[in-house]
A protein has these predicted regions:
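Catalytic core of membrane glycerolipid acyltransferases/transacylases, capturing the structured
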Residues: 51-79
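Divalent-metal-activated hydrolytic enzyme cores
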Residues: 1-45, 77-90, 95-105, 113-295, ...
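Active-site-adjacent alpha/beta core region of enzyme catalytic domains
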Residues: 48
Length: 326
């Protein structure tokens, strides 16, 4: 995978569409479908992740979570405002659809940073981690304003993501932070009581459904450290994206550091598109990817054939034209 970044653009595009085809075949397979159904039966909490468009922020990979379990929402810097008309509608629809099926909803509201070099942090906040954390708390308050602060059904959880080691940090209700990078594999058994102390107002079932992500992250951190010790991760912590994705439905990009994914939520879509283009340009200038082109990919998911699919095609064509003209 790491070699694909240096290939000519035509080969990279062919590789990407082959990746999408393989992902689709695997995702639709009986075994994968049954595995997802079993996982959701054991862990019924619906988990959504609000995160930055940065291609290094790949929570399913960092938590060893099967594809199709976590619902992603992406934007520049992880900057969201639930007052945005489209974002508010999408989130409300998601929550109502989950709760009507008897499921609680956990929102992971993420920010990211780098312990090795602040310049590898979040450009959307000018590498100011404190500002990013403050914004996640604002999002948490907005979610509580819309869905209630009792947290019996919808729980907004602030999470940090350290990109050098792909390590999660969980922010508790009293300001305490559980930094998984500071735990060893032998301390995995302590995660459950730590989480109970950290998040006493979180429903028991929801904590039980969050635990597999934390266990998976501990395992992933250990793998990352092994890669680092073998000098296999020197470039992976830096931007190497060569794809700009606009829209939703990019679950097949289950690969870190490949694409900058922009959700269609902000009333000002031009701003994140311009920022994404500047990151791609910087990647080319620094020699991290070839300068022979990049891919702009628009996608809109649909649930039903007929009108829903026709609208999705029209919206995808619009997003493609709009993005190309920015």
């Amino acid at each position: 995978m790491s070699e694909i970044h240096s290939k000519p653009i035509a080969q990279r595009i062919d590789w990407l569409f082959n990746l999408a085809r393989r992902h689709g075949e695997t995702f639709r397979s009986p075994e994968a479908w049954l595995a997802r159904e079993r996982y959701l039966a054991e862990h019924p909490t619906a988990i959504a992740v609000l995160k930055c468009m940065d291609g290094r922020i790949n929570i399913p990979v960092a938590t060893n979570t099967p594809t199709g379990i976590l619902m992603p929402f992406r934007n520049l810097g992880g900057i969201f405002d639930l007052g945005w008309p489209h974002l508010g509608e999408v989130l409300a629809h998601h929550v109502l659809r989950m709760t009507s099926a008897g499921r609680r909803v956990l929102f992971l509201i993420t920010y990211h940073w780098s312990k090795g070099n602040p310049q590898r942090g979040c450009a959307g906040f000018q590498y100011d981690t404190a500002a990013a954390i403050a914004h996640t708390r604002e999002i948490r308050q907005q979610i509580e304003q819309i869905f209630g602060s009792g947290h019996g059904t919808v729980y907004p959880l602030v999470c940090g993501f350290e990109t050098d080691e792909d390590a999660l940090s969980i922010h508790g209700t009293d300001g305490t932070v559980l930094d998984l990078a500071k735990l060893s594999a032998s301390e995995a058994s302590t995660l459950e009581p730590r989480l109970t102390t950290l998040l006493p107002d979180m429903p028991t079932q929801m904590r039980a459904d969050l635990l597999p992500l934390l266990h998976g992250n501990l395992e992933h951190i250990a793998q990352v450290r092994e890669q680092t010790s073998r000098h296999e991760r020197l470039l992976d912590v830096e931007h190497r994206e060569w794809v700009i994705c606009i829209g939703r439905g990019f679950d097949f990009l289950h690969t870190p550091n490949l694409a900058l994914i922009i959700g269609p939520y902000s009333p000002d879509l031009a701003d994140p598109l311009q920022k994404a283009a500047s990151i791609i340009e910087s990647n080319m200038a620094a020699g991290r990817i070839p300068d022979d082109g990049f891919l702009l990919l628009a996608s809109v998911p649909y649930d039903e054939i007929g009108v829903d699919r026709a609208r999705a095609e029209m919206k995808a064509n619009f997003l493609s034209r709009f993005s190309a003209n920015v």
